[in-house]
Amino acid sequence: MFEATLSRREVLRRGAAGAALLSTGSLFTAGNAFGRSGATVETVRWISPRGTLQVMDDFNLWVPLKMGYFKSLGIEAKLIAGSVTDALASTKFVAQNKADMGYPSPGVLTASIDSGMGVKSVWDVISGQVFNFGLPTDSKITSPKQLKGKSIALGSSGWKVIVDPMLVELGIDPKSVRYVSAGSSWMQAVATGKADAGLAWEGLRAQLAGQGLKLKYLIGTKWSKHPSNVYSVRAADLDDAAKRDLYTRFLQGVVMGLEFTKANPRAAAQITYRSLPDLQKTLKPQLALDSMLELAHAYGTSHLKGQGWGYNDAKGWSNYLKVVHDLGQTKKLLATKDVFTNELQVVANRKADAARARKDAKAYKLDKDFAQTKVRAGFTM
């Protein structure tokens, strides 16, 4: 049921599925960096929701990994591709101690907690809506509220659990729309007028444009307050001071990755792109940069509001929890305190060496391909 919310890029099938593991670094002593004199390395196993790591989405992890920020913080970061067949893998692996930090969608996180899994969000990557609606370029729809009574194309019927809460938030009865399950060509169905709208997301828009699809969009962050995919950990670990410190340091590295990206987006895109050989076969550098910029802007949602990177918005979560309960997606009406905490987020933002990241970014030398790329005018994060 929640498989589609977990692997929103499943239809693109870039890279190998399954629990393939990629790690860099080895056991070492962190030395004097970041005040961790003599500290031994500790491993954090992060699991993707997609069944692949061959996407630009995780630039905020590749940058601190490749720039040595995790290493300086005493962390060996292991990135796990995850499972494309197990919808709850990104929470289940964490609950079973096969991973330490997952990246579940709100639907997967709440379903997992509702079923008794002891996991909790410590970082909302976007702190707002990642999903959008794509429209034909000649569509007369100008507001998402006009989707009432319209047809919406989906890549899978399971995506209904993504769209239903979005419609309810807009005051639309999900029963009033007609879902069109069109497989991997769902956005082609929109472009050719076979559906009034289609589910899209940040990072996908640039890829669709690169494929020659002409569409316009109702951008979710402009009208939705619902949360997006989060970094979640075992709830019990949050009662362990050593684990809290470990995850906070990991998030400090994430903050540095984001600050680096803000200072030099092309460098962040180059680092990420060059780390992903399979992705290089399907995306050219400019398109990879464009895809990353869409996501990077969204990742900066709470930062632009002065709340720091990765803030879990209580109001947005509260509304979402009520909506999914009313829709029957959770049996219990979950309390926000059982779903997320911002305690680690606050400390990570305060302690991260943002100045070092910005300095490194400005000094980073671009290769020939990325030196020719352009950052779109007005980009912010």
What are these regions (language model features)?
Residues R178-S181, Q188-A197, L208-Y217, H226, ...:
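A residue-level marker of the well-folded mature domains of exported/periplasmic proteins
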